[in-house]
Amino acid sequence: MEFKLFDSELKVMDILWKEGDTSAKEIAEKLNEQVGWSKTTTYTVIKKCIDKGAVGRSEPGFICRALISRKEVQEAETNELIDKMYDGSSDKLIAALLGSKRLTAEEIQSLKKLVEKLK
């Protein structure tokens, strides 16, 4: 299952992933505080998420529920990045990430464990 969510839609999803089922009114209040969105803007973005199948709506109270997990979106976004920027090569992405920063001994050990798990 692949979803392309825009930054605005990810703001709505982030609330649902953190809070669980949440009313549209509460989402609008949170996003007004966080980024200054009006209620109308928030409801428009929620509608787009519903249309994409990322959010489910139940009544009464216009309760929103995430229908896709953060992990699914992370995987889809990562795969798109790999395809678009690294010619479909995961190892090129990893090399770019590792080449841009010095790793601590702990981070290196963690990466070794991850590689062993993938074998």
Put a short name on every predicted segment.
Residues 29-37:
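Short helix-coil junctions and helix-kink-helix linkers
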Residues 3-8, 60-79:
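Short, cationic-aromatic polyanion-contact patches
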Residues 16-20:
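Short helix-to-turn junction characteristic of helix-turn-helix DNA-binding domains
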Residues 44, 48:
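Alpha-helical DNA-recognition elements
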Residues 79-119:
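Amphipathic alpha-helical dimerization/coiled-coil segments
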Residues 22-30:
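Short acidic, hydrophobic short linear motifs in intrinsically disordered regions
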Residues 50-59:
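A short, conserved structural fragment
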Residues 10-14:
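Pre-recognition alpha-helix immediately N-terminal to the DNA-recognition helix
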